[in-house]
């Protein structure tokens, strides 16, 4: 890959068929992922929407791109409007079309506009920022398999952070893309009214039982975690349940390599 020098996005080659497109100039440190097959490509999320991620994806591939949405939070659907083929879990179709109930545009604009450390494009103005809303091209469910040509991706329904949150298992390379289910450096959030502590812990248990993983890619902060973190996830699940902590209001729980806030 020829090096892409971009003012906003950072492109990192994971392998010659997998790229991270990151937004390190924002406090969220968001990662989107472009996965190439022989017939088509998948873009896991489209970032913050501060700049148009399609400008980067076009430089990386000429394959037709399907956008797979880990969940319908504003920092993951920012450039959805630039793509024709958008897929979302069935439990968040309504959010994609109508927005998230009781999440004010004022709160979103405050969050998207704060703690920015890189120059933003002239087209970005937090005061008129609006998250994408629209109809998906297709609906995803747990167990769906997407074949992009000599590369199969399994959809895992992993709710908790949001009701229709999904993770993706890349069978070819053993990669697990966890969205906002698992990452480091900041708490995994399950304290909003639209979250579920019980579902989050069940989802963590679900991915902790996966085998033959080579790398875990969360959507924020450190790019690529060692699968050994799942041993700590298993311990965390037991600790949280045994101490009756899996409920709203119990605060931040810190473990080796990650933390969770209920």
List each language-model region with its residue ranges:
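Active-site HxH/HxHxD metal-binding segment of metal-dependent hydrolases
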Residues: 50-145, 228-250
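C-terminal regulatory/interaction regions
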Residues: 246-262
């Amino acid at each position: 890959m020829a090096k892409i020098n971009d003012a906003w996005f950072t492109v990192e080659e994971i392998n010659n068929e997998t790229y991270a497109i990151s937004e390190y100039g924002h406090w969220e440190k968001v990662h989107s992922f472009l996965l190439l097959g022989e017939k088509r490509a998948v873009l896991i999320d489209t970032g913050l929407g501060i700049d148009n991620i399609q400008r980067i994806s076009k430089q990386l591939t000429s394959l037709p791109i399907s956008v797979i949405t880990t969940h319908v939070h504003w920092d993951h659907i920012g450039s959805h409007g630039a793509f024709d083929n958008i897929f979302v879990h069935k439990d968040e179709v309504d959010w994609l079309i109508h927005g998230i109930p009781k999440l004010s545009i004022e709160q979103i604009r405050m969050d998207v506009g704060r703690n920015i450390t890189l120059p933003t494009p002239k087209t970005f103005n937090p005061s008129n920022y609006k998250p994408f809303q629209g109809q998906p091209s297709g609906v995803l469910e747990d167990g769906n398999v997407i074949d992009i040509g000599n590369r199969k991706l399994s959809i895992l329904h992993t709710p908790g952070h949001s009701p229709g949150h999904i993770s993706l298992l890349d069978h070819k390379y053993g990669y697990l893309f966890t969205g906002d289910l698992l990452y480091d450096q900041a708490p995994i959030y399950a304290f909003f009214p639209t979250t579920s502590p019980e579902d989050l812990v069940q989802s963590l248990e679900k991915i902790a039982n996966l085998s033959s993983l080579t790398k875990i890619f969360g959507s924020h902060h450190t790019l690529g975690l060692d699968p050994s973190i799942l041993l700590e996830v298993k311990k965390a699940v037991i600790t949280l349940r045994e101490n009756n902590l899996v409920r709203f209001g119990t605060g931040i729980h810190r473990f080796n390599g990650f933390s969770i806030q209920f």
